[in-house]
Amino acid sequence: MGQLGYTQGDLGWSELNTTDAAAAVEFYSALVGWEKKGEPMPGYFVFGREGEMFGGITNLQPGDTTPRWMPYISVDDLSATLAKAESLGAAVILPPMALPEDGGHIAIIKDPQGVATGLAQYNKKES
């Protein structure tokens, strides 16, 4: 089981890339009761509810003009999954990068239909 309680194939973490992250935090808090759980990196807000964290909200990167949600699918072995994705016709558009606080690693692929999807391998929780 992954750090956040996800297992292989689960749709887990979701991330909103938007033009105004702070305003989006306020909007979703008012709309559905999500709570801001912290800001582990400047401009990256973690949100959740009832003690659970399940997503992030951040500003678009320079040059990016398309606000969007990015789902992350949990995998047990990110390297093996990326290799398999490429063999099935996907392209890696963000190579593996470490999550803060030794949380694991993420990558983003573009599937054969052109859809960007995140993959995440979370580090195991210490008992």
What do these predicted regions represent?
Residues 1-7, 11-19, 60-127:
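Vicinal oxygen chelate
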Residues 2, 8-53, 87:
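Core segments of cupin and vicinal oxygen chelate
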Residues 2-6, 25, 56-59, 63, ...:
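A generic structural signal for ordered alpha-helices
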Residues 31-32, 76, 126:
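Generic alpha-helical secondary structure signal
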Residues 32-68, 112, 116-121:
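Conserved short beta-strand elements that form part of the metal-binding/catalytic scaffold
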